[in-house]
């Protein structure tokens, strides 16, 4: 059975995150685990003790239990908050049709926890902005780019508001990662049966038209109703126009391309498109095995 891992910190994106999780779980026929990562207790400094009769030894020995008590209290408080947050997630998921999600709370940072994560999963879901960036308009979650870069599984970055996903747009530049994204779309259950568009940003040359036509033919052979869009202009401008003009609900792209188009998403300017995009973004990792429906 496919597995979904939803990462939450209870930010303003959480309600949308849980609805997107329920949508994806229904599409994939998968199980859901909800992960909340809370800050680890800060380490405290133990002053060196002079065992040759230094009077400071007594104060150091008294400080240690006090610091330990503070650290333990902070940890208890963080665990209690995590439990409350996860129960809220379970309640919202149940209302959306997801029964009995696994609830997990771990200390550390989200990139650290995910890097050490051993249980297999097929889709990672998280909000565009976390609780620490909620007050900053259009700020991007500080850990998001790190997570996308290190993930070998697809990452669904959800928008603030949930809208049923009925049409999706694939960014395509003929790179290996773009071809991998096409293959994963065709082979996996997540987007099966939904109409889509394939967009290239470039001049209307015969070569570009042939490349785009080949990508659409591949999708059509896989059972998708695919439309072609070859547009001149900056990739970011073109993609925004296409999304709004044709009412797409999801943007799909490959990760780690060195092309100008996908460098706009993943690279030195990764944050810009995800920051400004008003619809969910599904980033396909190049190392991901395809998703298996029902197994």
What label would you give each PLM region?
Residues 13-27, 103-162, 242-295:
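Gly/Ser-rich helix-loop-strand patches that form or flank binding pockets
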Residues 1-68, 150, 163-230, 248:
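Small/aliphatic-rich secondary-structure junction motif
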Residues 94-102, 220-227:
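A short helix-to-beta-strand connector/capping loop
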Residues 108-111, 231-237:
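Conserved active-site histidine-acidic residue motif and adjacent donor-binding/catalytic loop
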Residues 67-91, 101:
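Alpha-helix-centered segments that form part of catalytic cores
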Residues 34, 102-105, 157, 198, ...:
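A structural preference for short, hydrophobic beta-strand core positions in alpha/beta folds
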Residues 21, 89, 114, 185, ...:
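Aromatic/hydrophobic pocket-lining residues that form π-stacking "cages" and hydrophobic walls in ligand
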Residues 216, 234-244:
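A short, acidic, amphipathic alpha-helical segment used as a generic capping/interface helix at domain edges
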């Amino acid at each position: 059975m496919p597995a979904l891992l939803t990462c939450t910190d209870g930010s303003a994106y959480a309600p949308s995150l849980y609805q997107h999780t329920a949508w994806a779980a229904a599409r994939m026929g998968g199980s859901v685990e909800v992960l909340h990562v809370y800050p680890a207790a800060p380490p405290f400094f133990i002053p060196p003790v002079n065992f040759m009769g230094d009077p400071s030894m007594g104060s150091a020995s008294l400080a240690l239990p006090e610091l330990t008590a503070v650290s333990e209290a902070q940890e208890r408080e963080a665990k209690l908050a995590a439990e409350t947050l996860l129960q809220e997630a379970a309640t919202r998921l149940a209302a959306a049709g997801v029964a009995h999600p696994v609830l997990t709370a771990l200390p550390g940072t989200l990139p650290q926890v995910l890097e050490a994560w051993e249980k297999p999963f097929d889709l990672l879901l998280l909000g565009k902005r976390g609780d620490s960036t909620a007050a900053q308009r259009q700020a991007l979650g500080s850990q998001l780019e790190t997570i996308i870069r290190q993930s070998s599984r697809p990452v669904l970055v959800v928008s603030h508001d949930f809208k049923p996903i009925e049409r999706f747009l694939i960014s395509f530049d003929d790179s290996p990662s773009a071809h991998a994204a096409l293959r994963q779309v065709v082979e996996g259950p997540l987007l099966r049966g939904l109409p889509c568009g394939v967009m290239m940003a470039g001049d209307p040359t015969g070569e570009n038209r042939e490349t785009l036509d080949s990508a659409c033919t591949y999708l059509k052979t896989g059972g998708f109703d695919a439309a072609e869009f070859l547009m001149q202009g900056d990739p970011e401008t073109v993609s925004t126009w296409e999304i709004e003009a044709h009412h797409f609900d999801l943007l799909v792209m490959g990760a780690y391309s060195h092309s100008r188009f996908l460098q706009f998403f993943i690279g030195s300017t990764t944050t810009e498109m995800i920051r400004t995009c008003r619809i969910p973004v599904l980033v396909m990792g190049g190392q991901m095995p395809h998703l298996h429906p029902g197994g």
